[in-house]
């Protein structure tokens, strides 16, 4: 039956629909809602903060919405003695320094050379962090557009995956290849998870492959154009039968006072666990919030059948108003806020790395 299902999916994938006009994209804005849009209409959706999957190259996924597998996530933290020393290694100044470099590219657009160069820089930083760990690797994930996604893998005793992700691309909503420093959206999340990775691999058990589960850190390409990179990765994982037991998304981490714990298109059990991590390992205030359909990359994991959670910089509506413009600069951000998000990532990743799931 699995073979027949795979063949059916392959047949659907080959039978890609023809756009009404050249250059149009097929977008999905709800579980059963798809339509063709022009490039201008698509960028208007970006500017109006309308979430969507671009499924032009994956039309078969329009009707695929796998219910995430249910896991019994821990009800208590078990590794405070190991995690708290790692939190002391998180440096707001280091996050800021990395973000100054990352937001210095003219833009990080998914289909521009500067987006390729910024991805290469991320890969170099990740390689410097995990390069001496036996069995660990950092790799480019190539797509049908210029910018690759970047993936760092720190193996554990099993092939079950605990994933942390952030999109690396930026966009100018009025002119996609125009100036887009993207300091908050999403340089902040990208550098937050890089800092967390740096702290995590300083732990001898993590670096020694003693964790029960494998850790993966992802920097996605093409989020702004319809969650493109994360769709590719998680749909491929689903097709290959990989088991992602948890995914935490970090998209915008540098603005506002009260974090927003996103409760739609996410896994309620994993979200409950994430709140416990916030309470234990950070000093952050947070409130529940909703961001709508396909608002960020956790939705790609959720759609592919993997439990996901998303902690945002603020309650939706109280977030950074300068995104998708040349004004999304580092001066508007709080490095200490990003450091709190990094603490969340470290606690989340460490506790689940050693959890029996």
From Swiss-Prot:
Keyword check for Acetylation: no
Sample GO molecular function, one term: metalloexopeptidase activity
What EC number(s) does the entry state?
3.4.11.-
Which terms are listed as keywords in the entry? Aminopeptidase, Disulfide bond, Glycoprotein, Hydrolase, Metal-binding, Protease, Secreted, Signal, Virulence, Zinc
The reply to whether Isomerase figures as a keyword in the UniProt entry is no
Q: From which domain of life does this come?
A: Eukaryota
Q: Which InterPro entries match?
A: M28_fam, Peptidase_M28
Which Pfam families does this entry report, sorted A to Z?
Answer: Peptidase_M28
Q: Where is the signal peptide?
A: 1-15
Glycosylated residues? 76, 186, 269
Query: Which family does the similarity line name?
Result: Belongs to the peptidase M28 family. M28E subfamily.
According to UniProt, the name of this protein is Probable leucine aminopeptidase ARB_00576
């Amino acid at each position: 039956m699995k073979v027949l299902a795979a063949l059916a999916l392959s047949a659907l994938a080959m039978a890609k629909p023809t756009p009404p006009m050249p250059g149009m994209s097929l977008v999905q804005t709800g579980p059963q809602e798809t339509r063709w849009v022009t490039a201008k209409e698509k960028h208007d959706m970006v500017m109006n903060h309308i979430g969507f999957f671009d499924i032009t190259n994956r039309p078969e996924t329009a009707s695929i919405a796998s219910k995430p597998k249910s896991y019994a996530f821990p009800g208590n933290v078990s590794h405070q003695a190991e995690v708290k020393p790692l939190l002391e290694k998180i440096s707001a100044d280091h996050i800021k320094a990395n973000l100054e470099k990352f937001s210095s590219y003219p833009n990080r657009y998914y289909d521009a050379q500067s987006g390729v160069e910024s991805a290469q820089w991320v890969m170099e930083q990740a390689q410097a962090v995990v390069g001496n760990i036996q069995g660990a690797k950092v790799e480019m994930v190539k797509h049908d557009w210029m910018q690759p996604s970047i993936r760092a893998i720190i193996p554990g005793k099993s092939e079950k995956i605990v994933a942390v992700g952030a999109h690396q691309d930026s966009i100018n909503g009025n002119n996609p290849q125009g100036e887009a420093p993207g300091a908050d959206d999403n340089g902040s999340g990208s550098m937050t998870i890089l800092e967390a990775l740096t702290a995590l691999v300083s732990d001898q058990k993590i670096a020694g492959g003693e964790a029960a589960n494998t850790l993966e850190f992802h920097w996605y390409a093409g989020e702004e154009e319809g969650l493109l990179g994360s769709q590719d990765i998680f749909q491929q994982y689903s097709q290959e039968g990989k088991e992602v037991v948890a995914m935490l998304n970090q998209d915008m981490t540098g603005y506002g006072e009260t974090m927003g714990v996103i409760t739609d298109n996410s896994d309620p059990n994993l979200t409950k666990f994430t709140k416990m991590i916030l309470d234990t390992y950070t000093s952050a205030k947070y409130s529940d919030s909703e961001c709508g359909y396909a608002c960020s990359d956790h939705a790609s994991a959720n759609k592919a059948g993997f439990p996901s959670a998303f902690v945002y910089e603020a309650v939706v509506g109280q977030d950074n108003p300068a995104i998708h413009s040349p004004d999304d600069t580092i001066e508007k951000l709080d490095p200490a806020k990003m450091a709190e998000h990094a603490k969340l990532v470290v606690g989340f990743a460490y506790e689940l790395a050693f959890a029996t799931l």
